[in-house]
């Protein structure tokens, strides 16, 4: 009787992480979240921004990319869309920023503000891509103009938190973080 144990192939995430020469914990965490965004949530145009590549405040890697649908709509923007009968699925999708973190990692307002300070202005994240502005309705053209001039809300990013306890289970939870505070809605 042979006691041959079949070899278990490494997961796609493990293979991605081990493809780096000397992966640091931050690199491994960032790649795990990048893999989750690409394969679980179908984000495109993903890019890792190495520490300090955006500013001196950016001490950790950040991820940017395009989600398949709008992640967050500011209450004032939502009111504008409703008032002008613009369907949310017709709105161009902004590039979004992701802050990789693990469960239990210590965060302060100063650290989070430093990350937000390193992000580009929201007007730079508007991606029109294949959107044909000339064919759009007047309301949609006005919406795009307003969004380019002064976007609703300040800078924002998704805080991607990985469950790292006991080796983790691959779960990633995303929290929307924003610069400043949105004003309360008026009913």
Regions inferred by a protein language model and the residue ranges of each:
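Acidic, polar low-complexity intrinsically disordered regions
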Residues: 5-155, 165-166
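Helix-rich interaction surfaces within compact, conserved domain-sized segments
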Residues: 144-187
């Amino acid at each position: 009787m042979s006691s041959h144990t079949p070899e278990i192939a490494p997961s796609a995430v493990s293979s991605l992480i081990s493809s780096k020469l000397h992966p640091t914990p931050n690199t491994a965490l960032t790649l795990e979240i990048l893999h989750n965004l690409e394969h679980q949530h179908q984000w495109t145009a993903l890019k890792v921004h190495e520490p300090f590549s955006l500013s001196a405040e950016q001490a950790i890697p950040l991820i940017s990319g395009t989600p398949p649908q709008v992640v967050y709509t500011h209450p004032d923007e939502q009111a504008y869309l409703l008032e002008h009968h613009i369907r949310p699925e017709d709105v161009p999708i902004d590039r979004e920023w992701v802050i990789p973190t693990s469960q239990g990692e210590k965060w302060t307002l100063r650290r989070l503000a430093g990350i937000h300070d390193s992000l580009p202005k929201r007007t730079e994240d508007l991606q029109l891509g294949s959107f044909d502005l000339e064919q759009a309705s007047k309301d949609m053209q006005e919406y795009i103009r307003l969004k380019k001039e002064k976007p609703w809300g300040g800078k924002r990013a998704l805080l991607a938190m990985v469950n790292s306890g006991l080796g983790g289970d691959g779960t990633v939870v995303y929290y929307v973080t924003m610069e400043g505070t949105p004003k309360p809605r008026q009913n």
